[in-house]
Amino acid sequence: MNSPTVYPVPSQISAHAHIDEQTYQRMYQASIDNPERFWGEQGKRIDWITPYSQTQVKKTSFDANNLSIQWFADGTLNASSNCLDRHLERNGDKIAILWEGDDAKEQRQLSYRELHTQVCQFANVLKAQGVVKGDIVTLYMPMVPEAAVAMLACARIGAVHSVIFGGFSPDSIASRVIDGKSKVIITADEGIRAGRTIPLKHNVDEALARPSVTCVNNVIVLKRTGANVDWQQGRDLDWDELMAGVSSDCPAEEMNAEDPLFLLYTSGSTGNPKGVLHTTGGYLVYAAMTHEYVFDYKENEVYWCTADVGWITGHSYMVYGPFANGATVLMHEGVPNYPTPARLGEIVDRHKVNILYTAPTLIRALMAEGKEHFNGFSGESLRIMGSVGEPINPEAWRWYHEVIGHEHCPIVDTWWQTETGGILISPLPGAIATKPGSATRPFFGVKPAIVDSTGQILEGAVEGNLVMLDSWPGQMRTVYGDHARFALTYFSTFKGMYFTGDGARRDEDGYYWITGRVDDVINVSGHRLGTAEVESALVAHEQVAEAAVVGYPHDIKGQGIYAYVTLVHDAEPSEALRQELRQWVRKEIGALATPDLIQWATGLPKTRSGKIMRRFLRKIAANEVTNLGDSSTLADPSVIDTLIASRLNQR
């Protein structure tokens, strides 16, 4: 493929940025040379009840037999008071949450003082239900301000929140509740998303009807739509009734830096849910610091992260990072392309959004609809734009840059994981020139390496497995209740290294390009080929909206290349177009990457967060369609039936 264009740092950004290129180089070197001193200084960005000692800043070992990750270990603090109380004196009247409903006519605002009051009240509600420090509280909520209230209320009293994305099934709820032995669930009657209601309370009822769920005493229900829902007297409690007249005085619990803050279950494709455990001190320092520097956040800016609170992005970059920094956060209940693709631009203009953080899935969906939907979009307020969730293909990057950013907003293409707590590799807007499709360089204190299959570190411009050689404060501490699984999953593949599970290549400028999950590598005739590269080539064709590529058993090559292709709305599928796309990929990458089979797909199997579930695609491509496994986490399970019916590899 043609070498990507480099987009220099805009001078109007670098002139006023927190971090310019020289500062980045100096700080990064200091963070690697002496992490204890570096993080000892950075830890001061949040408030501590008992300050940590310099000798306790970093106590970490990546040895799978002696695995331990501790940061600021003797310090004490409270995450809720860092997100709320410390802003009250100077910024109590500042807007903390700007909320827009699925229907744009519904708007709410909460100042930091109002948010603080509600959090303290709800913390007292939880205490009255017998919730104490260390208890796990499950949240299954719509995207409303009360979701943030409930999270911060848990943190205030030292309870550990476990947020389940509002699209997950009763089975998913049950397995997570059982694993965390949760006594209390917080939910709503219904959620609203893209004009449809989501039966949250009904799903909770179904989950709790399973004989295996015996730990839950109470379900607190917020009225979102006012729908009639089944009510179990004694167990089910009304949010508004509980909040009426309750005291707003609730001192924050003193927590050790290594006390758990939250659990977040990753929806692994197989096996039991994996409870990723994050603790209080290191996580909060890292979330606040990455939010400030990666987005070059300035006081009084409006910041919009389109992620749902049920994902790590919602935790780190809609709640904890922004609120620790005293930001004004836009929260949107629905999806930013409903009722029309113009919605994203309308929200940006209506609320004068300065920083936008969204996912490639949404960008590609908007791209497929056509840029004419943004003809009336001003975008004057936008300064920084971000991308999260998966590698963004260069074509979508350029579209985002031109149509949404009007070619003047730097794009921070951020790479990180639920397990990392915060962003690990990303441009800093005032410091690092960007290349479409590259996450560029590591954040401070982050020590990436590329290794071969034996764990040998590769230098220079190479491709291989992405690992981290040292810890950072936001790193997960364990898999809840299963430390052996933590060691096995992340530290046993490559000795003394954290294995991300992703492949990457590093170019001659030292920039990192994420090539996708290592299990998304196809071995064609002995040559390794990243699926992301083939997908990017396909999507670069003007008639392709989205593509997913997997390997399938091939009699001659070992693995062949099977592409699922969604066309833009006015394109017609044909055999001629199929051949054109094969030649297109051949020209873009080389003969080796030519897809063997191209299946037209009206939709792809995605989770509700927009991640493509490739295990289904791999099985369909391999003609293994009798036992596909659980599809309850898919946004639209019917997509699977359509793909099976039109599969190309039937024997």
Swiss-Prot record:
Enzyme Commission number, as recorded: 6.2.1.1
Record PTM text: Acetylated. Deacetylation by the SIR2-homolog deacetylase activates the enzyme.
InterPro entries: Ac_CoA_lig (IPR011904), ACAS_N (IPR032387), AMP-bd_C (IPR025110), AMP-bd_C_sf (IPR045851), AMP-binding_CS (IPR020845), AMP-dep_synth/lig_dom (IPR000873), ANL_N_sf (IPR042099)
Sequence positions that bind ATP: G389, E390, P391, D413, T414, W415, W416, Q417, T418, D502, R517, R528
One annotated GO molecular function: ATP binding
Pfam families from the UniProt entry: ACAS_N, AMP-binding, AMP-binding_C
Catalysed conversion reaction: acetate + ATP + CoA = acetyl-CoA + AMP + diphosphate
SUPFAM superfamilies linked to this entry: Acetyl-CoA synthetase-like (SSF56801)
UniProt GO cellular component terms: cytosol
Binding site for Mg(2+): V539, H541, V544
Transmembrane segments annotated in the record for this chain: none
Needed co-factor(s): Mg(2+)
The keyword Acetylation is assigned to this record: yes
UniProt keywords, alphabetically: Acetylation, ATP-binding, Ligase, Magnesium, Metal-binding, Nucleotide-binding
Keyword match Transcription regulation: no
Class of the enzyme per the UniProt entry, highest EC level: ligase
Binding site for CoA: R193, A194, G195, R196, T313, N337, S525, R586
List of residues that carry N6-acetyllysine: K611
One GO process term, biological-process aspect: acetyl-CoA biosynthetic process from acetate
Function: Catalyzes the conversion of acetate into acetyl-CoA (AcCoA), an essential intermediate at the junction of anabolic and catabolic pathways. AcsA undergoes a two-step reaction. In the first half reaction, AcsA combines acetate with ATP to form acetyl-adenylate (AcAMP) intermediate. In the second half reaction, it can then transfer the acetyl group from AcAMP to the sulfhydryl group of CoA, forming the product AcCoA.
PANTHER family in the cross-refs: ACETYL-COENZYME A SYNTHETASE
NCBIfam families cross-referenced by the UniProt entry: Ac_CoA_lig_AcsA (TIGR02188), PRK00174.1 (NF001208)
Family membership noted in the UniProt record: Belongs to the ATP-dependent AMP-binding enzyme family.
Matching HAMAP family: Ac_CoA_synth
Identification of the protein by name: Acetyl-coenzyme A synthetase
Organism in which the protein naturally occurs: Shewanella denitrificans (strain OS217 / ATCC BAA-1090 / DSM 15013)
